Amino acid sequence: MATYFFLGLLLTAVGTSSSSSASDLEGTWTTKSRQVVTGPGFYDPIGDKFLEPNLTGISYSFSADGHYEEAYYRAIANPQDPSCPKGVMQWQHGTYTVNSDGSVDLTPIAVDGRQLLSDPCQSSTGTYTRYNQTEHFESFAVSVDSYHGVQRLDVKNFDGSPMHPMYLIYKPPQMLPTQTLNPSSSSKSKRQVEGGTGGRFSIKDLVSREKVGDPNNWLWLGIFMTTLGGITFFRS
């Protein structure tokens, strides 16, 4: 009996051991819906538009040579009117550095980031803008998830709060080209988008798929309010 007990402890220790070296970050990571994934399936730099996933979530990709890409698709709860949430899609890419203390700094290419904000109870059009937000992760850890049996990435934000866990879906990562994709001289400015991304960004559908009462949506309200400060509006 004691043998089985200690064997169980050993297996648990192996399943939950984690590491936090720069090489462990390499790959494309996504939250449990596995629908939001970086790369050409989320943002089209040629058409300069978003492509709406079937479910909400976040995704980060890290290359071995120091480049990263991120994709966000979230519903933002409205405390004053729970039946009237906002929707936000965000994309940016750039370079990252893993510091000696285990923290990570992400520096985006300022002219390339994009955000689409939809507030259907205020307007039938979404607002499409350039987006630029540097990020700092206090720490990260990569382990084998004991339930799903796949590699899992746990990240703590700059203030120590945990992000939603992400799971490895591609290695090498699935990313768009890492150079500047939208030079400022040729990129579009803030604009109104009828129906979101070519008619696909449907916040009402989003609410029916992922209920606004989900506590995860309320958690992201605070994150949204923080990152909103990073939006750069630019001339039409």
From Swiss-Prot:
Spans traversing the lipid bilayer: 218-234
* One Gene Ontology term, aspect cellular component: endoplasmic reticulum membrane
State where composition is biased (Polar residues): 178-187
GO terms assigned for molecular function: unfolded protein binding
Q: Where is this protein localized, as stated in its record?
A: Endoplasmic reticulum membrane
Q: Does the keyword DNA damage apply?
A: no
> Lumenal face: residue ranges?
23-217
Write out the entry's keywords from A to Z: Endoplasmic reticulum, Glycoprotein, Membrane, Signal, Transmembrane, Transmembrane helix
- The region called Disordered is annotated at 178-197
Q: According to the lineage, what is the superkingdom? A: Eukaryota
Q: Which InterPro entries match?
A: Rot1 (IPR019623)
Glycosylation is annotated at: 54, 132
Q: Which GO terms describe its biological process?
A: 'de novo' protein folding
Tell me the leader sequence span: 1-22
| Major localization listed first in the record, in broad terms | endoplasmic reticulum
Q: Which residues point to the Cytoplasmic side?
A: 235-236
The family note in this entry says: Belongs to the ROT1 family.
| Stated role | Required for normal levels of the cell wall 1,6-beta-glucan. Involved in a protein folding machinery chaperoning proteins acting in various physiological processes including cell wall synthesis and lysis of autophagic bodies.
UniProt name for this protein? Protein rot1
